[in-house]
């Protein structure tokens, strides 16, 4: 039987590229998204790409009933699920004193609790099956410490902690868990950006556009990592290098290395 895959935020960006890769392999692919027109168009693309069953179910990951509805539908129609990819997410930036509590609540509800909801409703299905794979899309921002992005960093760090916790918790049930931490790459994350600093938003857009890997390339690295059963999937070598430095170097040395990296990311006019 073909693999059964559900991807949140699957109508565009990284989620769409992941869906297309699985579709080309003949999988049964369901995408959930809040954008219905995009979702329907991507569903058509998945069918043309070779999915044995391509579906779009409107799904807002901040609404418990939406996520539960997807789980119930796929359990009934497909008899379960093999791969859950919690991909839906948004971006936020700004100095700690400038970002409102409402913006903190907004990003936490989507980036963290949206992932929690997916894990919560699909884990019982995986336990009944005795197998399954949860793939949570975090970010290198969850492993490193990018200034003026505290709300985003916190949600992604929490997704990393959730994932590694569940990897240990669910192992005895035959359930695998992977967490993906990409750096900047060419995607549409800027569409969701809430920022108190227009200059920072502009810089982020440039960094995303100048990423060395495309969304399709990142997606392929993820699919390969899932197939290999990796827990941490780090698509960018530069990000992995910084993470190793943070873990193993004295903090003073790591901090100097990281600050230098941050300076290179800034526009020339904003450096020093």
Name each region found by the language model:
Residues 139:
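Residue(s) in the substrate-gating loop at a strand-loop-helix junction
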Residues 119, 155:
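Active-site helix of classical SDR
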Residues 172-237:
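SDR active-site lid
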Residues 95-96, 103-108:
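Substrate-binding pocket helix/loop in short-chain dehydrogenase/reductase
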Residues 97, 144-150, 154:
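Active-site loop immediately N-terminal to the catalytic Tyr-X3-Lys motif
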Residues 36-37, 58-69, 101:
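The beta1-alpha1 cofactor-binding region of Rossmann-like NAD(H)/NADP(H)-dependent oxidoreductases
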Residues 1-30:
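Canonical Rossmann dinucleotide-binding motif of NAD(H)/NADP(H)-dependent dehydrogenases/reductases
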């Amino acid at each position: 039987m073909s693999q059964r895959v559900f991807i949140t935020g699957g109508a565009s960006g990284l989620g769409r590229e992941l869906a297309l890769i699985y579709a080309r392999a003949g999988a049964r692919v369901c995408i959930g998204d809040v954008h219905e027109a995009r979702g329907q168009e991507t569903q058509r693309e998945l069918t043309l790409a070779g999915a044995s069953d391509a579906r779009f179910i409107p799904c807002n990951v901040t609404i418990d009933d939406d996520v539960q509805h997807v789980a119930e539908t796929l359990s009934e129609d497909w008899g379960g699920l093999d791969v859950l990819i919690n991909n839906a997410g948004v971006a936020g930036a700004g100095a700690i004193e400038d970002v409102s509590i409402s913006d903190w609540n907004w990003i936490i509800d989507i980036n963290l609790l949206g992932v929690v909801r997916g894990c919560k409703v699909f884990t019982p299905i995986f336990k009944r099956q005795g197998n399954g794979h949860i793939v949570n899309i975090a970010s290198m921002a969850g492993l490193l410490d990018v200034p003026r992005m505290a709300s985003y960093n916190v949600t992604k760090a929490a997704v990393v902690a959730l994932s590694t916790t569940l990897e240990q918790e669910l192992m005895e049930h035959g359930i695998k868990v992977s967490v993906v931490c990409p750096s900047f790459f060419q995607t549409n994350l800027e569409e969701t950006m809430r920022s108190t600093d227009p200059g920072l938003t502009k810089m982020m857009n440039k960094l995303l556009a100048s990423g060395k890997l495309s969304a399709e390339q990142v997606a392929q690295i993820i699919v390969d990592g899932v197939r290999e059963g990796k827990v941490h999937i780090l698509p960018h070598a530069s990000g992995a290098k910084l993470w190793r430095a943070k873990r193993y170097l004295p903090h003073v040395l790591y901090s100097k290395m990281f600050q230098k990296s941050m300076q290179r990311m800034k526009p020339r006019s904003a450096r020093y």
